Design a protein with these regions (language model features):
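Middle-to-C-terminal accessory/interaction subdomains
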Residues: 1-4, 9-11, 16-204
Length: 205
C-alpha cells in the first residue's frame, strides 16, 4: 500500500505474486517491485502520493480482489492493517530513516554512476531521481498519516468527492524517477535486447 506497487495483485493485471498455504494459513508473497512508487499505471504524482489506503486497488473494483477486500472488510484486520501502516510511517518516515537510507545508498554508488560510461541516464538525471524519490516518499507518508487520522479521505470515492483535502504533490514529476521502455541507444538500453530506464518527459501533478 505505502509503496504503490500496481504491477501486482492490486491492479487490473493481477500478477507478480504467489499464494502460499501452510496449515490452513494463506500468505501472499508479492514480488517484482521494480515498478513500485507509481512506476506502473501510477498516473500523475498526486494519485501516487494520495493512493487510498482503504481501497488500495487500481483499474478494478475491490470485489474483484477478494484477498484485499475480505481482509479490509473485517474490522479487526482493518485495525491491525492500519496499525502496520502507522508503524511504517512512524519508524521509517517520520523519524527520517527513509531519507537517511536513501542518502546512504546514494553515497555508496554515486561515484560509480558518475563514471559509468554505459549508464542509462546522465549523472544529473540520477541525482535528480534521488532527490525526487526522497520527496515522493515523504509526501506519501504525509498522505498515509492523514488518511489514518481522518484528515484525508482513505477511499477512492472519498478522495474523488473531496480533492481539496489531498496532499499536494506540488511540481513533483514522476518521470524524474525514470520509466521502463526507454534507455539509451537503439536497443532500449541493452545491447541486443530491451530494457533500461528512460528519463524525462513525464507527467506532473
Amino acid at each position: 500500500t505505502i509503496v504503490v506497487n500496481l504491477d501486482s495483485y492490486s491492479s487490473i493485471m493481477a500478477q507478480n505474486y504467489y499464494i502460499y498455504e501452510r496449515n490452513g494459513k494463506i500468505t501472499i508473497l508479492p514480488w517484482d517491485y521494480n515498478l513500485a512508487w507509481g512506476g506502473f499505471q501510477g498516473g500523475n504524482a498526486s494519485s501516487v502520493v494520495n493512493f487510498p489506503i482503504d481501497t488500495p486497488v487500481s483499474g478494478v473494483d475491490m470485489s474483484r480482489r477478494p484477498l484485499i477486500d475480505k481482509l479490509l472488510s473485517n474490522k479487526e484486520y482493518l485495525e491491525r492493517y492500519h496499525g502496520y501502516l502507522q508503524h511504517l510511517v512512524d519508524n521509517y518516515f517520520a523519524n527520517g530513516k527513509f531519507e537517511e537510507k536513501i542518502k546512504a545508498l546514494d553515497a555508496l554508488i554515486s561515484d560509480y554512476v558518475k563514471n559509468d560510461a554505459t549508464a542509462f541516464c546522465t549523472y544529473d538525471e540520477y541525482k535528480k531521481a534521488v532527490s525526487t524519490f526522497i520527496t515522493l516518499g515523504n509526501l506519501r507518508a504525509q498522505s498515509v498519516q492523514g488518511q489514518l487520522d481522518g484528515s484525508i479521505p482513505s477511499t477512492t470515492a472519498g478522495q474523488n468527492a473531496n480533492p481539496s483535502k489531498l496532499v499536494s504533490a506540488g511540481n513533483l514529476n514522476l518521470s524524474d524517477l525514470g520509466r521502463m521502455g526507454g534507455g539509451r541507444g537503439n536497443n532500449m538500453g541493452f545491447p541486443g535486447g530491451i530494457g533500461g530506464w528512460q528519463f524525462g518527459g513525464g507527467q506532473q501533478d
